[in-house]
């Protein structure tokens, strides 16, 4: 028979003992603040403490003291309370620090909870942004209707001039008279008798999209404004020659300058600025960094979470970005650095010499040459010159770097117990060809 309350009761008793410093045999010093705890509890809850206490398992009679500088006392308080109570107090301000400390202490459960907390915070922020964008779209549409009705009152006076020759029933917008008949902006007597055209309703969404694009580009709006004014003064008699689509677009382009022409207050004028339109931006919930794509936000969050998903296949070092891994592999593992065959130290043309034994050629540093004896080993000066700077006649030799800049390959030459790795890297035209790296396995 299992009693479910026994585990929680046991944790409560251990936590009470910790608070009263009863049977505490371990002291943790974090930036000058001392925390009392029990070694068996720390051993069971943290992989780092398990490794640390296993080394001192023979000295159980002496109290253990551990010192940490990787995190703050407040962060360790949250983790220690979780160990003794099972409750993790996470906030938007401490989740990154707690996750970093849990990663240091090798507490996988805490790391998983922190990742879930961060993901839920991002989901909430995304929902809030979607709600803001939907409200902004509604406000933009309502503002557009108000502007259109306001502008129609101003254009009615101008459309009453003798220049408007077409009747509203024809459904064709006039450039000079600025007739708004195709938008159904008519007086009350005409609205009851005139029916909207199907083609105009179909193009309503496309006109709104063009209007939003125009508002996001003020320079193009100014260009259309000046061009329309010139067309209005130079060609006042070209009415019926314009097509219906051109008249509709031109009427929309003229709607924004009206707010400046009539000057009916800052409310109407301010609504025409592109700042009121929604913009797709992703803001980091832990700093002020703002990006345009969600993928960039995920990559930025790695600097807060400490996640490094890209390991180096050669040395095991992990990186947070793929380009950093590529740069590391090129500069560290693919660099043609000359090493001594005996001591494996880096040598240059001054600190080492090329030695030839039969058909094998390798490089030794001056110290190793002194230990082995320079007289007992033949020094191949010609081979050293070829290794340092290959000449034109040695292009077919396997001891120099190829000049094909479009390829990168590794040629392995097996000779006895030594392997010579000849590697080509992409160099600029101004750089000299690098020396060969003998890699002794």
Swiss-Prot record:
GO biological process, any: regulation of transcription by RNA polymerase II
Ranges of biased composition (kind: Low complexity): 234-248
Organism superkingdom: Eukaryota
GO molecular function: DNA-binding transcription factor activity, RNA polymerase II-specific; RNA polymerase II cis-regulatory region sequence-specific DNA binding; zinc ion binding
Region (Disordered): 146-252
Ranges annotated as biased composition (Polar residues): 146-170, 178-197
Zinc finger (C2H2-type) stretch: 282-304, 310-333
Modified residues (Phosphoserine): 161, 167
Covalent link location (Glycyl lysine isopeptide (Lys-Gly) (interchain with G-Cter in SUMO2)): 178, 182, 199, 437
Main location: nucleus
Keyword Glycosyltransferase in record: no
Keyword Transcription regulation attributed: yes
Ranges of Basic and acidic residues composition bias in the record: 198-208
Keyword line: DNA-binding, Isopeptide bond, Metal-binding, Nucleus, Phosphoprotein, Repeat, Transcription, Transcription regulation, Ubl conjugation, Zinc, Zinc-finger
Domain BTB: 24-92
Location in the cell: Nucleus
GO cellular component: nucleus
Database matches in InterPro entries: BTB/POZ_dom (IPR000210), SKP1/BTB/POZ_sf (IPR011333), Znf_C2H2_sf (IPR036236), Znf_C2H2_type (IPR013087), ZnFinger_BTB_dom_contain (IPR050457)
Pfam families: BTB (PF00651), zf-C2H2 (PF00096)
Function: May be involved in transcriptional regulation.
Protein name per UniProt: Zinc finger and BTB domain-containing protein 8A
Lineage, uppermost ranks: Eukaryota, Metazoa, Chordata, Craniata, Vertebrata
């Amino acid at each position: 028979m299992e009693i479910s309350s026994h585990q929680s009761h046991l944790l409560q008793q251990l936590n009470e003992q910790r608070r009263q410093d009863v049977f505490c045999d371990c002291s943790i010093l974090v930036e000058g603040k001392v925390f009392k705890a029990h070694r068996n509890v720390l051993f069971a809850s943290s992989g780092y403490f398990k490794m640390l206490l296993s080394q001192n398992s023979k000295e159980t009679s002496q109290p253990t003291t551990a010192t940490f500088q990787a995190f703050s006392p407040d962060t360790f308080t949250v983790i220690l309370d979780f160990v003794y109570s099972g409750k993790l107090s996470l906030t938007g301000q401490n989740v990154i620090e707690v996750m970093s400390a849990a990663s240091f202490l090798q507490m996988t459960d805490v790391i998983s909870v922190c990742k879930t907390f961060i993901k839920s915070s991002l989901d909430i922020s995304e929902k809030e942004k979607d709600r803001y964008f939907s409200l902004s779209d509604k406000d933009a549409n309502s503002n557009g209707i108000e502007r259109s009705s306001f502008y129609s009152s101003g254009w009615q006076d101008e459309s009453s001039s003798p220049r408007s020759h077409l009747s509203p029933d024809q459904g064709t917008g006039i450039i000079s008279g600025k007739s708004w008949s195709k938008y159904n902006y008519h007086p009350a007597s005409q609205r009851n008798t005139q029916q909207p055209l199907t083609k105009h309703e179909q193009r309503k969404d496309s006109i709104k999209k063009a209007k939003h694009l125009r508002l996001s580009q003020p320079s193009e709006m100014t260009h259309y404004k000046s061009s329309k004014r010139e067309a209005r003064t130079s060609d006042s008699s070209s009415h019926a020659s314009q097509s219906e689509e051109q008249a509709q677009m031109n009427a929309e382009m003229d709607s924004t300058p009206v707010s400046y022409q009539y000057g009916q207050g800052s409310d109407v004028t301010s609504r025409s600025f592109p700042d009121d339109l929604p913009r797709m931006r992703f803001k980091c919930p832990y700093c002020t960094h703002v990006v345009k794509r969600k993928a960039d936000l995920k990559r930025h969050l790695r600097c807060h979470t400490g996640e490094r998903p890209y390991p180096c296949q050669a040395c095991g070092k992990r990186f947070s970005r793929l380009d950093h891994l590529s740069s590391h592999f090129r500069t560290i593992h693919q660099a043609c650095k000359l090493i001594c065959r005996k001591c494996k130290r880096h040598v240059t043309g001054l600190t080492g010499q090329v030695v030839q034994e039969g058909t094998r050629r390798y490089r030794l540093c001056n110290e190793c040459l002194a230990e082995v004896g320079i007289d007992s080993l033949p020094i191949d000066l010609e081979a050293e010159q070829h290794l340092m700077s290959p000449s034109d006649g040695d292009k077919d030799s396997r001891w120099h770097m190829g000049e094909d800049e479009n390829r990168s390959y590794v040629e392995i030459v097996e000779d006895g117990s030594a392997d010579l790795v000849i590697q080509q890297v992409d160099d600029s035209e101004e750089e000299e060809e690098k020396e060969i790296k003998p890699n002794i396995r």
